[in-house]
Amino acid sequence: LRRDEEVSLTILSKICKTLHADFGDIVEYVPDAEIWDLYNENRELLGKDHIRGEQLPIDGYHLVVHVWIRNSKGEYLISQRSANRPTYPLMWECVGGSVVKGEDSLQGAIREAKEEVGVDLIPENGQVLFTKTRKIIDGKIYNDIMDVWLFEYDGEVDLGNATTDEVAQVAWMNREQIKELFEHNIFVETLEYFFTEVDKERR
């Protein structure tokens, strides 16, 4: 397969299964393919790969990170999703995304921060606040293990250093300002745990 061929990843996966080929050897030739490691419910690696966009197996989970970045003023770095995002366009959120094949949760959190908002987080300045396993939501197999990170960061923020175009703009906001965004329904609603689990000491 040539790199410039537009081949469906789903079809590739089926071809691999039919030919008993190693998917990793083939998918590397397909641009922009995001591959995840699969885990069981106990967070043990299954030794299987999964293509983003395909239906997850009922017994397979992937790692997801939410990354809250806080400065010494108690403000949080939040971002507005680009208008071309397929879900929640132009809504506000924290940094976040899926951990890709070969990464651990910390590596995924640091990569996502660089990709989305252009900041270089220091591993020692981060901590996992809590972990949640999400299964079936509204009849859909969700199957992820979500780590919620909090990083302390007082450095510069320049969206020009981001490596993707997923974010339209960024801002430092305090609890009350974030609450106002929620009240106007322009903050991703699944992040409402912020008030009880992330900024809980400021209640």
Give each language-model segment a name:
Residues 25-32:
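Short amphipathic recognition helices of helix-turn-helix/homeodomain-type DNA-binding modules
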Residues 1-7:
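Recognition helix of helix-turn-helix/homeodomain-like DNA-binding domains
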Residues 10-25:
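DNA major-groove recognition helix of helix-turn-helix/homeodomain DNA-binding modules
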Residues 64-96:
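A glycine-rich, hydrophobic loop/mini-helix early in the fold
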Residues 28, 110, 180:
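Phosphate-coordinating loops and pocket residues in cytosolic domains that bind phosphorylated ligands
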Residues 53, 130-203:
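Nudix hydrolase/Nudix homology domain
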Residues 32-66, 70-72:
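Acidic, metal-coordinating catalytic segment for phosphate/diphosphate chemistry
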Residues 77-78, 94-128:
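The catalytic Nudix box helix
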